[in-house]
Curated annotation (Swiss-Prot):
<dbReference type="GO" id="GO:0022857">
    <property type="term" value="F:transmembrane transporter activity"/>
</dbReference>
<feature type="domain" description="ABC transporter">
    <location>
        <begin position="5"/>
        <end position="226"/>
    </location>
</feature>
<dbReference type="GO" id="GO:0089705">
    <property type="term" value="P:protein localization to outer membrane"/>
</dbReference>
<dbReference type="InterPro" id="IPR011924">
    <property type="entry name" value="LolD_lipo_ATP-bd"/>
</dbReference>
<dbReference type="InterPro" id="IPR017871">
    <property type="entry name" value="ABC_transporter-like_CS"/>
</dbReference>
<comment type="similarity">
    <text>Belongs to the ABC transporter superfamily. Lipoprotein translocase (TC 3.A.1.125) family.</text>
</comment>
<dbReference type="GO" id="GO:0005524">
    <property type="term" value="F:ATP binding"/>
</dbReference>
<dbReference type="InterPro" id="IPR003439">
    <property type="entry name" value="ABC_transporter-like_ATP-bd"/>
</dbReference>
<keyword id="KW-0813">Transport</keyword>
<keyword id="KW-0067">ATP-binding</keyword>
<feature type="binding site">
    <location>
        <begin position="41"/>
        <end position="48"/>
    </location>
    <ligand>
        <name>ATP</name>
    </ligand>
</feature>
<keyword id="KW-0997">Cell inner membrane</keyword>
<comment type="function">
    <text>Part of the ABC transporter complex LolCDE involved in the translocation of mature outer membrane-directed lipoproteins, from the inner membrane to the periplasmic chaperone, LolA. Responsible for the formation of the LolA-lipoprotein complex in an ATP-dependent manner.</text>
</comment>
<keyword id="KW-1003">Cell membrane</keyword>
<dbReference type="GO" id="GO:0005886">
    <property type="term" value="C:plasma membrane"/>
</dbReference>
<keyword id="KW-0472">Membrane</keyword>
<keyword id="KW-1278">Translocase</keyword>
Length: 227
């Protein structure tokens, strides 16, 4: 096990021309390979902003994010896009599946974007959908799937490129207790298979307690989560 990602003194400030709003203030964190880290916080605490920065979807006001000791903000736009597609997976509370495509096509999309041959991309996508228990739903569009099934498709899509790190924003937030438990078990199984690391943003303290480690984000700053 080694350190996969580290951020130092990460800050984010928005300026609307009249006043400045400090969203994140000197955030420091690290995550190791195969580790599940929870970040707990209320709405508006900056959790989603932090994930956007860790995923190179936004630029910080100050601070650094190192992924395997490489500064992701020193990458060109093309390098950042390649980094996101090949090294990261994203899971959101809203699944963001493309409604006009089947489950199989949605999951294959990251590999198709990476210019993999369609036949190979579909093969990998089918394997991943089988792992999440959706072998019988390959040709179904999102509108034909249940909420839990759509979230499993989103997780399969996040993992189809075998990313080293998955960033998950409230992955069980819209699900009932039974379906949410199934998603948690699935994350564990896939972590064990692929050694993927997870950073999970949640307001669900019970979920956070089941992960390897948890931090609380309050007023833009991180601190250890106490039981």
């Amino acid at each position: 096990m080694h350190e996969l990602l580290k951020c130092d003194h990460l800050s984010k400030q928005y300026d609307d021309g009249k006043e400045s709003v400090q969203i994140l203030n000197n955030v420091n964190l690290s995550v190791n390979t195969s580790e599940q880290l929870a970040i707990i916080g209320s709405s508006g605490s900056g959790k989603s902003t932090l994930l956007h920065l860790l995923g190179a979807l936004d630029q910080p006001t100050s601070g650094t994010v190192l992924f395997e000791q490489h500064d992701i903000f020193s990458f060109t736009s093309a390098e950042q896009a390649k980094f996101r597609n090949q090294s990261l997976g994203f899971v959101y509370q809203a699944h963001h599946l493309l409604p006009e495509f089947s489950a199989l096509e949605n999951v294959a999309m990251p590999r198709l974007i990476a210019n993999e041959k369609r036949e190979e991309a579909m093969h990998h996508a089918q394997n991943m959908l089988e792992k999440v228990g959706l072998a019988h739903r390959l040709t179904h569009r999102p509108s034909m799937l249940s909420g839990g099934e759509r979230q499993r498709v989103a997780i399969a899509r996040a993992l189809v490129n075998q990313p080293k790190l998955v960033l998950a924003d409230e992955p069980t937030g819209n699900l009932d207790t039974k379906t949410g438990e199934g998603i948690y078990q699935l994350l564990n199984e896939l972590r064990d298979i692929s050694q993927t690391s997870f950073i999970v943003v949640t307001h669900d303290i019970q979920l956070a307690k089941r992960l390897d480690r948890s931090l609380r984000l309050v007023n833009g700053q991180l601190s250890p989560q106490l039981d």
